[in-house]
Amino acid sequence: MSTQVSASSLAQIPQPKNRPVANFHPNIWGDQFITYTPEDKVTRACKEEQIEDLKKEVKRKLTAAAVANPSQLLNFIDAVQRLGVAYHFEQEIEEALQHICNSFHDCNDMDGDLYNIALGFRLLRQQGYTISCDIFNKFTDERGRFKEALISDVRGMLGLYEAAHLRVHGEDILAKALAFTTTHLKAMVESLGYHLAEQVAHALNRPIRKGLERLEARWYISVYQDEAFHDKTLLELAKLDFNLVQSLHKEELSNLARWWKELDFATKLPFARDRLVEGYFWMHGVYFEPQYLRGRRILTKVIAMTSILDDIHDAYGTPEELKLFIEAIERWDINSINQLPEYMKLCYVALLDVYKEIEEEMEKEGNQYRVHYAKEVMKNQVRAYFAEAKWLHEEHVPAFEEYMRVALASSGYCLLATTSFVGMGEIATKEAFDWVTSDPKIMSSSNFITRLMDDIKSHKFEQKRGHVTSAVECYMKQYGVSEEQVYSEFQKQIENAWLDINQECLKPTAVSMPLLARLLNFTRTMDVIYKEQDSYTHVGKVMRDNIASVFINAVI
């Protein structure tokens, strides 16, 4: 199958007259990622050998901390995780936290120490252990309020704030803890010394639970090296590992950027967003580890194609053309291109090529069943795009519930979450695919967050250019409330959905933690990309800086 469509046919692509063209800004990166030259094999092998030696030393220190005292071990594990190198020590961390969990409530070493108790609670919850929140009762007064004396313990307050983000439904003490710590940390941040103020401000903007591992590691390396008692071996490992993984990511991105440039959609489909780099950043947030190279490549190609499909449906295609396109998608047959307009042929052929490539890879390993799931979620995605396009052209404003039924399918979450399993190893069994496509609670909650965060930040731009109504407009019309009231209500619903996610990540889990981590990480990417604005569509300073920090600038 070839992605080449006659260049002469491009002249037949309809001009933007009477089409809802969005005028997206062009790609801001040029060819800088294409021109990346990987370091030579000898240099890379030398760095890998250094890292292996440092890993052995850190592993030895983890073992030593485990036989020392719980506080020392918890702080070392926390540093390992926040510096982004925990993937090297998964078994050691699991064994250490299992041991701590068995005696956490009876541990005298941390009696009355808010910071270490909160740290232990957070680390155990992150690992999936159902540790009771009753451990915080000792920090409340007879009326159930947190003691005022805690306010002066800034590290303890910060630890409690982070721990509260791991709460589940019914844990009122942690809801109170979040309100208590947020209020007082905001009040004190400007009066703190620089080092502590930076940590507090960072946490208030994005707690650990909602941060992307690579972005957080990049930031925390600079914080950790300023700590008076940092571990030099661990810091050296974190820096070397970050830079080595960054070089692998740059090589991957270079190959993907070359593939994207050969398709030449920027020229041939100028109405669509050209966001290959941003898409790779998004997907690297789902799994950054070197062993998931194939998963990142597959996901990046799928999100790149999905972005084009999205723009065809709400930024260019006519109702008649879109009907032809959905029929072709349902058939999933290269011969269907004959009925399509020229610009759709380009997209359709490229889409089938991407899935053909996936299919060939899966066949080599006997995992071709995965392709069926991948194709079906893509078909569902396009069906949802088509339904929304019909609403737009019919000027239909659906009820909120009607809107959400379609919008949860069009958000892309189900498509990408399911596809993220395709590029993983044998851990992604057929049973895992059956589970992820059955809309389990963690999926529906994460998808809900994805849709609402997207709509909150993108609806104003979309309504200006002519776009299907968003959740915001549907809710305002149905309930007769203001835009600000909708935002407030949606934020409450988003936070409530996070409680569902936290609950679903506690043991015993429906599927293994590595699979759940993909779904959790997708939700985290939304907080990074959509918290301030739609940073995928409108690539501003925050997105540029984030991409530079993980793909361009090495750690020194």
Curated annotation (Swiss-Prot):
It is found in: Cytoplasm. Residues 1-12 have a biased composition (Polar residues). Mg(2+) 3 binds at residue 462. Its cofactor is Mg(2+). GO terms for biological process: diterpenoid biosynthetic process. Pathway: Secondary metabolite biosynthesis; terpenoid biosynthesis. Keywords: Cytoplasm, Lyase, Magnesium, Metal-binding. Belongs to the terpene synthase family. Tpsa subfamily. This is Valencene synthase. The gene is ValCS.
